[in-house]
Amino acid sequence: DIRCRIEGLASYYAAKNASPEGLARLRHIMDLQEFYFEKRDAEHLREMDDQFHDVICDMSGHAVISDTLVPLHRKTRRYRKASIADASRTAQVVKEHRAIFDAIAAGDADRAAALTTEHTIHAKKSMIERMNNHG
């Protein structure tokens, strides 16, 4: 629950503080993520997922957000990797990331925060399901 709120705050501030350079980095990651999705390359998709969230943290301009989320991302990496291996979840992740990117690019901080919170809730549910089914 804490991660969901902090991820939402990261996107909120990323939308408020978005620079052309930050948006270009995020757009490039989105393009690569869509490319790797088409190739069904789960390993690179996970890397793009990590980078997507890391760039949003950077764009937020808040060190406390980055200092809090980076260790959480490391702790959940194994489960996020397993979740991304699921093709149906991967398709949803790509779609959710695109919507988050669009909100950040539009400067719509409230929408970016809401979409990111929703995305993180979906990821959490997927991770819990994976842990329950696969230990």
Where are these regions (language model features)?
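Short arginine-rich
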Residues: 121-131
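Short acidic-aromatic low-complexity motifs
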Residues: 104-107
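Solvent-exposed loop and edge beta-strand segments that line ligand/cofactor-binding
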Residues: 85-89
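Conserved amphipathic alpha-helical segments that form helical-bundle/coiled-coil interaction surfaces
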Residues: 2-5, 9, 16-82, 95-101, ...
